[in-house]
Amino acid sequence: MTAQILDGKKAAAEVKSELVERIAALVARGITPGLATVLVGDDAPSQSYVRMKHQDANALGLASFERHLPAETSQDELDAVIDELNANPGVHGILVQIPLPKHLDEQAVLERIDPDKDADGLHPVNLGRLVLNVNGVITSPLPCTPVGAIQLMLRNGIELAGKHVVVVGRGITVGRALGLLLTRREINATVTLTHTGTVDLAAHLRQADVVISAVGVAHMIKAENLKPGVVVLDVGVSRERDEVTGKSKLLGDVAPDVADVASWISPNPGGVGPMTRALLMSNVVQAAEAVSSR
């Protein structure tokens, strides 16, 4: 068996195409959706991620607000930047690029963002709304990467209702939110949330219809621990030095041999990543629409 590819770039292009008409309607009413990013320090991967997000925003005609602060920025200085963006009516979505330098309190920073401008969907208020709402429509921002992973499957005709999904990774950004989204009645999957401390992880993986891994441990998901026909999404990112070139290269959680047993597999990069960025744009547009309806 050779797995079919879950093409994140193609699915992301579909999401962006669906946003074009909504953005045009907002602009016609005098509202241009605006994305603001805050980057602290000079971490090269973070700079790349922020650059790609603004490229997406510019391609769609969104307004861009970039705040690049030095690594020694204090908590008070960072808070002041977030307060300024919260108060700016042209900004509809704010994203603080993480990780932050160790002297800064990431959780306090995320909580300081106006929940209505929470482009990443990670504010405690918005996560709380997700916890409390199992049945109804959710109008608050949703976490981009988990929604992107689910949309990537649904847009490829993968049925999730009644399926056993094993999520590897308990982080707020992906793992915990995935469980909340997948168990909503509109999806109706059964979820096992595992992590690097799970005893006999392989036993859980062998029972899975779908595996979504987001722990950042290179190639920890191996073919020998999966049943034939499983759907596998690789969300984890780790870095390894290439012994030949001396350069750092990106590796996912999923080993190459998994493609021989899976029915579908997401590449990394090129799988969930593009969907994360597309859903970020969607959250910004949704926030602008909420403002326009007031």
Curated annotation (Swiss-Prot):
Pfam hit, one: THF_DHG_CYH_C
Catalysed reaction equations from the record: (6R)-5,10-methylene-5,6,7,8-tetrahydrofolate + NADP(+) = (6R)-5,10-methenyltetrahydrofolate + NADPH; (6R)-5,10-methenyltetrahydrofolate + H2O = (6R)-10-formyltetrahydrofolate + H(+)
Record EC number: 1.5.1.5, 3.5.4.9
GO MF term set: methenyltetrahydrofolate cyclohydrolase activity; methylenetetrahydrofolate dehydrogenase (NADP+) activity
Biological or metabolic pathway of the protein: One-carbon metabolism; tetrahydrofolate interconversion
Gene3D superfamilies the UniProt entry points to: Leucine Dehydrogenase, chain A, domain 1, NAD(P)-binding Rossmann-like Domain
Record GO biological process: L-histidine biosynthetic process; methionine biosynthetic process; purine nucleotide biosynthetic process; tetrahydrofolate interconversion
Parts forming coiled coils: none
Keywords: Amino-acid biosynthesis, Histidine biosynthesis, Hydrolase, Methionine biosynthesis, Multifunctional enzyme, NADP, One-carbon metabolism, Oxidoreductase, Purine biosynthesis
Gene Ontology CC annotations of this record: cytosol
Residues annotated for NADP(+) binding in this entry: 169-171, 196, 237
Taxonomy, superkingdom: Bacteria
Assembly: Homodimer.
Role played: Catalyzes the oxidation of 5,10-methylenetetrahydrofolate to 5,10-methenyltetrahydrofolate and then the hydrolysis of 5,10-methenyltetrahydrofolate to 10-formyltetrahydrofolate.
Family named by the database record: Belongs to the tetrahydrofolate dehydrogenase/cyclohydrolase family.
The name this protein goes by in its record: Bifunctional protein FolD
Protein's organism: Renibacterium salmoninarum (strain ATCC 33209 / DSM 20767 / JCM 11484 / NBRC 15589 / NCIMB 2235)
